[in-house]
């Protein structure tokens, strides 16, 4: 057996040494299309391993390209191009031995000419591939594609010359000519290459546009777009950018002196157009450089003496006197005083008494007699005594007044501690005096939240009253915030914790005289003073939601409010987790103060915590109540700073590259792309008084009525889901129910009030306590949008408890505007007490948190394919810009152009818009219109999986 096997081995070795593969290779030379799959070899060898594979190449002009391939161990290596074997004559083969392993390394090289590539027909590019043989089998290399390189001469779009004002944004567009490979683009400024890394005022977008963020005078230059690849270099036409400066007036100089020193004249002042001076063709200052005005200088009047008086009787000194005054006229307006003496004297005894003539200004005049000094001192003493008496009287009065105020404070404090505090939902008994049934001070129609000060009702304010009823139009609402003040805490600013519904948890049936209830309020007040640090935490589950997110992203949603926060995939850095929260701020202090025709259009929403590092924008969705008509509104997004004041973030249609966010405005909501979390609110300002905002009218009645009185509360709210949900929760605590489905009212910026009235009341069984025919809410209280739960109350009285049917019409309309009519029909005994509970606890009404891929409609694989296909600029414009246009997101494309993946940001915005329905039909339709059929196939395939 051993001899037989040895003979077989010797025979096999002889055959291997004698075998020649030349016939097969000759078949290749003669046009054969196939090589044997394997050659006889020793079974110990391994499969060939490629050390060098052919790479993609471009044929420049007519120069052929060389393809190299190296493998070991390999007995043969051949190229196969477009499915056909390359002739053996076209191969250049080199062999060497690996010193470490002793294996044979074979390297093969071929050339591919331009003619070979041009002769190829079909849609696929010309390709070549290496096939290496060894005794163990064959190995194929990667495919290398060979293309003919070119670069067309004409640009698809060239930059245009522009003249722009100083500090404005400049956009220079450039679409390079078509070429293979795709041309690289650079910009020249006066023949110097622009490097955005060195000058951050320049920005090169992903579609090769040049943006100057804020034009400077030094940016006045010639700009050229340069496209180049391995074939050629093309230059666009030069675009000249001129940055001009419009002239500005300097401050007015001082008025010149009046032209006339006396009487009417003129004076002028001047200014110059040098702040700044116009440059580079900028406009000259508008207005006058000189102003003139009339002036009147009062003329000076010199004083003049009156006539001398008659001589006085002769004195004991043998002299008599006469006087005169400087009053004819007196000196005025800087005139000169009279010159001369005021008194004159002379001897009156015809020489019997020899006395020299004396005058008032004679230095030898006689001194005052001692009797004059005594009178002077006596007067001073009397004056001192009078002053002391006055001071003592004032001191006594002040002392008595302080004592009286102190007694009052003690009385007020004791009253607050022993039952002086009346809860808001307690109604005092009406006095027997019939005159008191008609108070002179009418109720406040517009108060929506009160501050309780001692025993006075919060909603019984005296401001903005309308005399039309004898009962409060606004019943006190127990769930409103209440601040308790006494003589020791007034002015301290401390109150109950924000958002705490204190009265909603009190035991029913208690009254102001109940000491336990007063003690309960005092306890809550003291507890709130020590818990101020808890005010910022999102505690109300109906208006807040939180979750922990990683790099996969997710979504926070407060159902029933239209408020959500989308955290895209990749927004949070890899390996980090953020605890995010979303909250609707319910207090009026969290809303900005409206000025002029400004109004709050959305709820104030906080997403946090602030200061987190985000790798891509998140999308905050808030509802709004504006009737969006082009040209009627000036929309703004505002944020609340750390100091509490509100700052403007962006004005829509006035965005620049420095704008930190983007707003996508829909008919009833606004989607905001944010780089920073914080507190935001959407506001609007009426443009030329033509804006219209939507109101939501809702009528509530008590679910249980055991008295003769019956009240209807008509709420006038912003037409947002969040506003209605807040009122539903409020009415549930009051024991009310929604009488009829809410209706929408268009409220115009016309300064006209909102009028509410009742009609068709069955007077045989009911009577209205409203003295006037209607009630009105002032226009500004409705328009500013910063007052919560704005409503009016209609109080009715039935003649007997047997009357359980009530019908009427409620008309709500704006004076000289639109209106709505409610037809009410209710049965007091059969009122569905649980209607509000059903609304407030409807399915999906709990806050939701979606994490990871489940929060998104587009699978991640499809999203990546769409981004890879559309992010790169296309000369035909069939890229992300067209997608933004198809999805109506092209209001400000420069925002997306500055992002690393514009398509990804657009898809994030699409995800936020599709929160409710969420099908892919709209996106699929847009891709189909763009001609991206391969994306539709991917969406169908991956979507089914």
From Swiss-Prot:
Alphabetized Pfam families for the sequence: Death, I-set, TSP_1, UPA, ZU5
Domain named TSP type-1: residues: 246-300, 302-354
Site residues by UniProt (Cleavage): 412-413
Residues found modified as Phosphotyrosine: 581
Maturation and modification: Phosphorylated on cytoplasmic tyrosine residues.
Disulfide bonds: 69-130, 81-128, 174-225, 258-295, 262-299, 273-285, 314-348, 318-353, 326-338
Predominant subcellular localization, coarse grouping: membrane
Region UPA domain, annotated ranges: 689-838
InterPro entries per record: DEATH-like_dom_sf (IPR011029), Death_dom (IPR000488), Death_UNC5B (IPR042156), Ig-like_dom (IPR007110), Ig-like_dom_sf (IPR036179), Ig-like_fold (IPR013783), Ig_I-set (IPR013098), Ig_sub (IPR003599)
Extracellular compartment segments: 27-377
Transmembrane segments: 378-398
Residue span of region Interaction with DCC: 707-725
Signal peptide stretch: 1-26
Subcellular localization, as worded in the UniProt entry: Cell membrane; Membrane raft
Glycan attachment residues as annotated in the record: 222, 347
GO cellular component, one term: plasma membrane
Stretches of the chain found on the membrane's Cytoplasmic side: 399-945
Ig-like domain boundaries: 48-145
Stretches assigned to the ZU5 domain: 543-686
The keyword Protein transport is assigned to this record: no
Tissue: Mainly expressed in regions of differentiating neurons. Expressed in the developing sensory ganglia that flank the spinal cord from E12, peaking at E14. Expressed in the roof plate region of the spinal cord from E14.
Biological processes annotated in GO: anterior/posterior axon guidance; apoptotic process; axon guidance; negative regulation of extrinsic apoptotic signaling pathway in absence of ligand; negative regulation of neuron apoptotic process; positive regulation of extrinsic apoptotic signaling pathway in absence of ligand; positive regulation of phosphatidylinositol 3-kinase/protein kinase B signal transduction
Subunit structure: Interacts with the cytoplasmic part of DCC. Interacts with GNAI2 via its cytoplasmic part. Interacts (via death domain) with DAPK1 (via death domain). Interacts (via extracellular domain) with FLRT3 (via extracellular domain); the interaction is direct. Interacts (via extracellular domain) with FLRT2 and FLRT3 (via extracellular domain), but has higher affinity for FLRT3. Identified in a complex with FLRT3 and ADGRL3; does not interact with ADGRL3 by itself.
Recorded family membership: Belongs to the unc-5 family.
Function: Receptor for netrin required for axon guidance. Mediates axon repulsion of neuronal growth cones in the developing nervous system upon ligand binding. Axon repulsion in growth cones may be caused by its association with DCC that may trigger signaling for repulsion. Functions as a netrin receptor that negatively regulates vascular branching during angiogenesis. Mediates retraction of tip cell filopodia on endothelial growth cones in response to netrin. It also acts as a dependence receptor required for apoptosis induction when not associated with netrin ligand.
Name of this protein: Netrin receptor UNC5B
Taxonomic lineage from the root: Eukaryota, Metazoa, Chordata, Craniata, Vertebrata
């Amino acid at each position: 057996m051993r001899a037989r096997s040895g003979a077989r081995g010797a025979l096999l070795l002889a055959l291997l040494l004698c075998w020649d593969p030349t016939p097969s290779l000759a078949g290749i030379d003669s046009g054969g299309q196939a090589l044997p799959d394997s050659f006889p070899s020793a079974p110990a060898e391994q499969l060939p391993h490629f050390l060098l594979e052919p790479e993609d190449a471009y044929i420049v002009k007519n120069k052929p390209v060389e393809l190299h391939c190296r493998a070991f161990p390999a007995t043969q290596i051949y190229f196969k191009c477009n499915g056909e074997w390359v002739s053996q004559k076209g191969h250049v083969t080199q062999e060497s031995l690996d010193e470490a392993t002793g294996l044979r390394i074979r390297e093969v090289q071929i050339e591919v000419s331009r003619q070979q590539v041009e002769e190829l027909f079909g849609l696929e590019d010309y390709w070549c591939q290496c096939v290496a043989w060894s005794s163990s089998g064959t190995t194929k290399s990667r495919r290398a594609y060979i293309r003919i390189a070119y670069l067309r001469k004409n640009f698809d779009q060239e930059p245009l010359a522009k003249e722009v004002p100083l500090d404005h944004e400049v956009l220079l567009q450039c679409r390079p000519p078509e070429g293979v490979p795709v041309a690289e683009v650079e910009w020249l400024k006066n023949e110097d290459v622009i490097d955005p890394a060195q000058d951050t005022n320049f920005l090169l977008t992903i579609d090769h546009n040049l943006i100057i963020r804020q034009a400077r005078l030094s940016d006045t230059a010639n700009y050229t777009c340069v496209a180049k690849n391995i074939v050629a270099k093309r230059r666009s036409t030069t675009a000249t950018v001129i940055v001009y400066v419009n002239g500005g007036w300097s401050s007015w100089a001082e008025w010149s002196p009046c032209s006339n020193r006396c009487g009417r004249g003129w004076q002028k002042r001047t200014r110059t157009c040098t702040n700044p001076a116009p440059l580079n063709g900028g406009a000259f200052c508008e207005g006058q450089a000189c102003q003139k005005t009339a002036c009147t200088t009062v003329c000076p009047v010199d004083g003049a003496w009156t006539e001398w008086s008659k001589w006085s009787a002769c004195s004991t000194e043998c002299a008599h006197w006469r006087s005169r005054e400087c009053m004819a006229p007196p000196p005025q307006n800087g005139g000169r005083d009279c010159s001369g003496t005021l008194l004159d004297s002379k001897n009156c005894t015809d020489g019997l008494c020899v006395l020299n003539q004396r005058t008032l200004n004679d230095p030898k005049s006689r001194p005052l007699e001692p009797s004059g000094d005594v009178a002077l001192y006596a007067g001073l003493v009397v004056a001192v005594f009078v002053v002391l008496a006055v001071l003592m009287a004032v001191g006594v009065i002040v002392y008595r007044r302080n004592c009286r105020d102190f007694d009052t404070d003690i009385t007020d404090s004791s009253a607050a501690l022993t039952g002086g505090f009346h809860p808001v939902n307690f109604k005092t008994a009406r006095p027997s005096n019939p005159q008191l049934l008609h108070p002179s001070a009418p109720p406040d129609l517009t108060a929506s939240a009160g501050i309780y000060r001692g025993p006075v009702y919060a909603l019984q304010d005296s401001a903005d009253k309308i005399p039309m009823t004898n009962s409060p139009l606004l019943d006190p609402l127990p769930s409103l915030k209440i601040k308790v003040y006494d003589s020791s805490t007034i002015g301290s600013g401390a109150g109950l914790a924000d958002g705490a519904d204190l009265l909603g948890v009190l035991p029913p049936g208690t009254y102001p005289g109940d000491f336990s209830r007063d003690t309960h309020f005092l306890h809550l007040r003291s507890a709130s003073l020590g818990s101020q640090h808890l005010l910022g935490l999102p505690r109300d589950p109906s208006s807040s939601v939180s979750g922990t997110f990683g790099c996969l992203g997710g979504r926070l949603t407060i159902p029933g409010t239209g408020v959500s926060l989308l955290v895209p995939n990749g927004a949070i850095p890899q390996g980090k987790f953020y605890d995010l929260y979303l909250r609707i701020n319910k207090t009026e202090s969290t809303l900005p103060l409206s000025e002029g025709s400004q109004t709050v259009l959305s709820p104030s929403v906080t997403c946090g915590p602030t200061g987190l590092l985000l790798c891509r924008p998140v999308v905050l969705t808030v509802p709004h109540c504006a009737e969006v008509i082009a040209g009627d509104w000036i929309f703004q997004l505002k944020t609340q700073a750390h100091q509490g004041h509100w700052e403007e973030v962006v004005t829509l249609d006035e965005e620049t590259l420095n704008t930190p966010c983007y707003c996508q405005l829909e008919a009833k909501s606004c989607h905001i792309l944010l780089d920073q979390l914080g507190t935001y609110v959407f506001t609007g300002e009426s443009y030329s008084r033509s804006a219209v905002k939507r109101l939501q009218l809702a009528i509530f009645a008590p679910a249980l009525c055991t008295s003769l009185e019956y009240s209807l509360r008509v709420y006038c709210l912003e037409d947002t889901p969040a506003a209605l949900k807040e009122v539903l929760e409020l009415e549930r605590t009051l024991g009310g129910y929604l009488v009829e489905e809410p209706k929408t009212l268009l409220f115009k910026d016309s300064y006209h009030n909102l009028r509410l009235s009742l009609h068709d009341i069955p007077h045989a069984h009911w009577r209205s306590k409203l003295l006037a025919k209607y009630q009105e809410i002032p226009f500004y209280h409705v328009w500013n949008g910063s007052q919560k739960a704005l409503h009016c109350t209609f109080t009715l009285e039935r003649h007997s408890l047997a009357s359980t049917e009530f019908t009427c019409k409620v008309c709500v309309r704006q004076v000289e505007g639109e209106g709505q009519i409610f037809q009410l029909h209710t049965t007091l005994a059969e009122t569905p007490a649980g209607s509000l509970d059903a609304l407030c606890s409807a399915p999906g009404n709990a806050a939701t948190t979606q994490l990871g891929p489940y929060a998104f409609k587009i699978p991640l694989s499809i999203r990546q394919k769409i981004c890879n296909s559309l992010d790169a600029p296309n000369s035909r414009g069939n890229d992300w810009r067209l997608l933004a246009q198809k999805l109506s997101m092209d209001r400000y494309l420069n925002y997306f152009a500055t992002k690393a993946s514009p398509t990804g940001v657009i898809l994030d915005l699409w995800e936020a818009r599709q929160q409710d329905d969420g099908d892919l039909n709209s996106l699929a339709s847009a891709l189909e219109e763009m001609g991206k059929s391969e994306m539709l196939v991917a969406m169908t395939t991956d979507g089914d999986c």
